[in-house]
């Protein structure tokens, strides 16, 4: 069984490498709603974000909605990330199994820039006016274990981005499946994220006055007009991944993960990660993200988790660190409670 699992990991690695070396235009910066790509959970982030085949748990739903069908108990997750340039990212998820129906899931994602000074050519140090950039996504999902080996899930998201008095609102869908390949617990996961139509910004900040004929005199030189913005797609992403568990003893387990990614606004890449669990109390994690991506600025990730039971509930705290070539390192903390 271990040979089979290892061979499958190699297949995914080779596929991602072949895709990543292909000569293709990356289309970086050509999508809206890129905050949807910020992975919320510290567990997955510490594993290099190789999460499409992460074994069942509420933190896996972001990567693959199909894992929602594997959840066996109600759970609540809260995650906070100190993002670049003082930006904060917060995420709340709630999963509830309903006997005879399936599992339901709801989530709230919020990204906020804090106050930013308005600067103009005349006042480069600031006009005294401040504005904020705020992004919100509200999700509602459903997952079902179809057979003992196969589960699938679907999530709908209402997405809103606001820059001062200009905003865009749209709806996206996430869908995924996960399949257990053998009795050892090797999982194969596939997911599609942020599937939807194109969107564009509107708002009163786009209102201007317009002189239809600057050379004419006596006409209205301040006609009210509105600047139109182009429509852009959402940051779609395909994931295909494997997880391979290795049990050394009842008190020591290793989980290896690898996945290939195909985004619509960058080149193909690969994420890998490993998790070592000790005595169901402490977990050490490491990973590497966006391997083989053209001009990747990301790299190694590290983290840990501790868990324990209290009053019949399971509590888990996770931490993740991720490096960046040019910007500050990022830190995520996550709290999970399973009832």
Predicted regions and their residues:
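Short, basic and Ser/Thr-rich N-terminal targeting/leader segments
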Residues: 56, 72, 87-88, 136
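N-terminal secretory signal peptides that target proteins for export/translocation
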Residues: 1-3
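Outer-membrane beta-barrel porins/channels
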Residues: 25-48, 89, 93-339
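Short, flexible, solvent-exposed loop/turn segments with mixed acidic/basic and small polar residues
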Residues: 5, 66-68, 305-309
């Amino acid at each position: 069984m271990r040979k089979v699992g290892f061979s499958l990991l190699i297949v995914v690695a080779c596929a991602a490498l072949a895709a990543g070396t292909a000569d293709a235009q990356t289309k970086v910066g050509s999508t809206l709603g890129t905050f949807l790509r910020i992975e919320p959970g510290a567990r997955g982030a510490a594993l290099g974000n190789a999460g499409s085949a992460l074994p069942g748990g509420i933190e896996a739903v972001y990567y693959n909605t199909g894992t929602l069908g594997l959840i066996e108990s109600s759970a609540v997750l809260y995650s906070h990330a100190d993002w670049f340039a003082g930006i904060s990212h917060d995420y709340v998820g709630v999963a509830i199994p309903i006997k005879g129906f399936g599992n339901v899931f709801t989530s709230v994602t919020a990204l906020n820039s804090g106050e930013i000074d308005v600067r103009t050519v005349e006042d480069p140090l600031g006009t005294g006016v401040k504005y904020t950039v705020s992004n919100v996504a509200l999700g509602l999902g459903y997952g079902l274990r179809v057979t003992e080996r196969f589960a699938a899930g679907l999530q709908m998201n209402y997405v809103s981005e606001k820059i001062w008095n200009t905003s865009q609102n749209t709806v996206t869908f996430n869908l995924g499946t996960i399949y257990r390949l053998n009795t050892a617990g090797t999982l194969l996961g596939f997911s599609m994220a942020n599937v939807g139509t194109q969107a564009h910004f509107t708002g009163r900040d786009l209102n201007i006055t317009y002189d239809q004929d600057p050379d004419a005199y006596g006409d209205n030189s301040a006609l009210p007009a509105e600047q139109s913005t182009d429509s852009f797609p959402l940051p779609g992403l395909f994931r295909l991944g494997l997880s391979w568990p290795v049990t050394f003893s009842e008190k020591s387990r290793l989980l290896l993960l690898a996945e290939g990614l195909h985004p619509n606004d960058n080149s193909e890449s690969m994420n890998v990660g490993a998790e070592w669990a000790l005595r169901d109390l402490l977990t050490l994690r490491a990973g590497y993200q966006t391997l083989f991506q053209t001009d990747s600025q990301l790299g190694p990730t590290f983290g840990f988790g501790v868990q324990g039971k209290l009053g019949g509930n399971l509590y888990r705290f996770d931490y993740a660190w991720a490096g960046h070539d040019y910007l500050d390192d990022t830190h995520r903390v996550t709290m999970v409670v399973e009832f």
